[in-house]
Each structure stands twice: as C-alpha cells, then as structure tokens.
C-alpha cells in the first residue's frame, strides 16, 4: 500500500486536521462533510438543511482555530471516548478523531481509566501534529454508541496502514 493524499480540513501552527482514509480509499468523514456542507446529509437525525450548513460552518471554523491555536472554541467541544479516540462535538453531531505523527505509529495519550479521574476535560497539549478525523454520527443517548467507537478504531487502524507503506 502506498502513501495516499488525505483531504486537509485545516493546517496551522499547532495541528494539521485531515480526514482519515480507509483501506478501500473511502473517507467516512469526508463524505459526511460533503453532505452537510450542502444540507443534504440523510443520517443526521432531524437536522434541517440550514441547520446542517450552520453545523458545517461551525465545524470548519473550529478546525481552523484548532489547527492554528491548538484549541476548540469552548472547553466542552470535545470528549475522549476510548482508546485514544476523541470526539469534536457541537449540538447532536459528533466527529471522532485520533492523533498521529504520520509514520503509522500510534499510542493513546490518555487511557480511559486515567481520563475518568480528571475533574475537568483534558486537552492534551502534547497531541501529535496530525489529527485524523475518522467517523461522524448523531448522538441520541447519554454515551457514544459503542459501535461508533469501534468503527472509529477500525478506520484509525486502516488509515495508519497507509502511513506505514513506502
């Protein structure tokens, strides 16, 4: 497998936010963003087209700030889910991501056990430069659906494989 080009959402002093790519060269987040940009996504609950477009605009601006300054607009705009999978959240929509150095290696910065002991939401200052967006979903329950977390981990595994190949 050869290195591939990823859709870059934002690149700045702190991070490069880009879409992860699966083994079959699809990108779930890229496809999701294309849908909500035009208000045409069909798996976003009851969000009307204009709400989808507003969410897209918020997300793109949030990624610009994240890439340049290393932070999201508000401290409640993210969560760590499990095993190094994080989410950017706004309203009911979620986009999962992980960090990497771009070499195909991966090690979670904070595990779920240590995360549960924090009294505030941690934002690791030592995230690696590449933040790869993996999946998108609508959150309708108090916790992220386990199947969504597993899918994000699968996309991460497949995406990192591209980095390991010459």
Outline where the language-model segments fall.
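Basic, Lys/Arg-enriched alpha-helical interface segments
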Residues: 1-92, 101-131, 137-166
